[in-house]
Amino acid sequence: MPAPLTLDGFRADLAEFLYQQPDEVDLEENPLYAGLDSLRIVTLIERWRETGADVSFIELAECTSFDQWWQLLSARQGGAGHVTA
């Protein structure tokens, strides 16, 4: 069973695609305004599915902040994603 996605891992994944440090990722920022295009979002979705978070592109596209993404992802892991380590 894959390790669940953590908030730290989520921030690190976003930072990689945004060319930032994980602590620079603003979770209140709109993903589309942050510069994530559809290809990058699909790549992230595939990565997160490997951790057990089953979300779709449409579900993420309806969210208006990275924090909403995190809430959806962590809920899809049965709450296991609330770990920060």
Curated annotation (Swiss-Prot):
Keywords: Fatty acid metabolism, Lipid metabolism, Phosphopantetheine, Phosphoprotein. Residues 1-77 form the Carrier domain. InterPro entries: ACP-like_sf (IPR036736), PP-bd_ACP (IPR009081). It comes from the Bacteria. GO terms for biological process: fatty acid metabolic process. The keyword Zinc does not apply. Its cofactor is pantetheine 4'-phosphate. The keyword Lipid metabolism applies. Gene3D superfamilies: ACP-like. The modification O-(pantetheine 4'-phosphoryl)serine is found at S38. Pathway: Lipid metabolism; fatty acid metabolism. Acyl-carrier protein (ACP) involved in the biosynthesis of a unique class of isonitrile lipopeptides (INLPs). Is the dedicated ACP for the loading of activated acyl groups catalyzed by ScoC. Belongs to the acyl carrier protein (ACP) family. This is Acyl carrier protein ScoB. The lineage of its organism: Bacteria, Bacillati, Actinomycetota, Actinomycetes, Kitasatosporales.
